[in-house]
């Protein structure tokens, strides 16, 4: 089968690979769609870790074509979305319910072969059944949505809170919808790319501000009456985190969601943080949230079909890693159904 294999930093190869032997509680999935995540770019650029010679891709959905003998509840032909994060259930963190810190954590598309391939082996524990009519392209958003749910949980948004979302890409648009569901009364999205502004407005943002505006802080403070109750940072850069610290009101909560390249840091004004009684949280992985993501998607409480997706086949998937990632495209998805895409 064709696969996109991570060899080393800035080195991806499209090669023929073979599936390993199937275990009794595993499924073989024909991949329909697999989202390209910012983490994939971090891995490619050497800013995040993955096991060498692993097939990348961790945001995927597809159809069961083979099942092991111990796969009750699943049938050949079923469509599924896949939670890539595999926890041991035995370490102290898992026993304490903090599975995101599992000492033996594995992830499809990072430490184990993932979805940038024609086929992938998936444990039944990671497979979530989908309605037959539900779009597999939309289902591939389940993994990033499940991570965003964790971020929203960390924010602890209360009814009537003002929320600023820093970054209007795919993650920001998912966070925007989750913030509305959580009861936020006023949501501001900060995004420099004007071509992305309309999507945030369509999905319910009350205001859009550009970080390049000279009076950004004045406008944000005026709109939120002195700062937001919650700020959710969805960029993964020191500048975005520093801006978040300036946008939060006294007693507010900041959630640092974006994954910054390894080694990046910020300067924190300790006295300002002290006087504001800030709560600063981070959000890691998707503990116990994947099922919630599936429910939100299939019940159309979170809308992803309006987020523009560029579909890429094997002939062009590696090109986006070797060219500039800064583009107007909100979401790339790999699909092995395409022969030519660019």
Positions of the model-derived regions?
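Mid-domain Rossmann-like dinucleotide-binding core that forms the NAD(H)/NADP(H) cofactor-binding site
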Residues: 135-214, 218
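Residues in the short beta-alpha loop(s) of Rossmann-like NAD(P)-binding domains
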Residues: 193, 260, 286
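Short Gly/Pro-enriched turn/cap motifs at secondary-structure boundaries
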Residues: 7, 18-19, 51-57, 108-112
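C-terminal hydrophobic helical "lid"/dimerization subdomain
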Residues: 3, 242-246, 287-342
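NAD(P)H dinucleotide-binding glycine-rich loop of Rossmann-like/cofactor-binding domains
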Residues: 88-166
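Glycine-rich cofactor phosphate-binding loops and adjacent beta1-alpha1 units
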Residues: 155, 203-277, 340-342
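Short glycine-centered segments of the SAM/dcSAM-binding site in methyltransferase folds
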Residues: 79, 162, 252-253, 279
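Glycine-rich beta-strand-centered segment in the early N-terminal region that forms part
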Residues: 20-34, 47-92, 131-133
